[in-house]
Amino acid sequence: MNKITCICLGVRSMERSIHFYRDKLGFKTDCKENNPRVCFFDTPGTKFELFPLDLLAKDISADNPPVIGNGFGGITLAYNVDRKEKVDEVFELVRNAGGNIVKEPQNVFWGGYHAYFTDLDGYYWEVAWGPNFKYDENGFLKF
């Protein structure tokens, strides 16, 4: 078990979240309706899924669903880019889309350039560029 095939985010409003990711940030999906039961986005190598938060909690355990909260859960999602300037470009897109800027783009101790934002449900995203980031022929990050 050494591959992540799908990342699922439980969201409070499918319509609002689909609009944010599909229409504002440009994620590709076959979701035609704005309030489906589930929505998958195509990202290279991994599916990205939105699912209603309350239904996701019940799917995990109908008898004892996890408590839904607003706190930081110790996980971030990341989008790594191939040019330093792209971090600023992505953050302008996020800002215009209504994302919450948590940390403005800045140089970081390891020689890179990064920033953080949260989406409409409070999930943390890092956008980062590194001088030593290398990508394969499919655009996948190699370390």
Indicate where each model-derived feature is located.
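Short coil/turn motifs at secondary-structure junctions
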Residues: 55, 82, 130-132
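A short, acidic/glycine-rich surface segment
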Residues: 57-64, 134-137
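Short linear motifs in intrinsically disordered
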Residues: 26-32, 82, 105-107
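Vicinal oxygen chelate
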Residues: 4-12, 39-42, 62-143
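N-terminal beta-strand motif that seeds the catalytic metal site of vicinal oxygen chelate
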Residues: 1-18, 74-79, 131-143
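Core segments of cupin and vicinal oxygen chelate
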Residues: 8-57
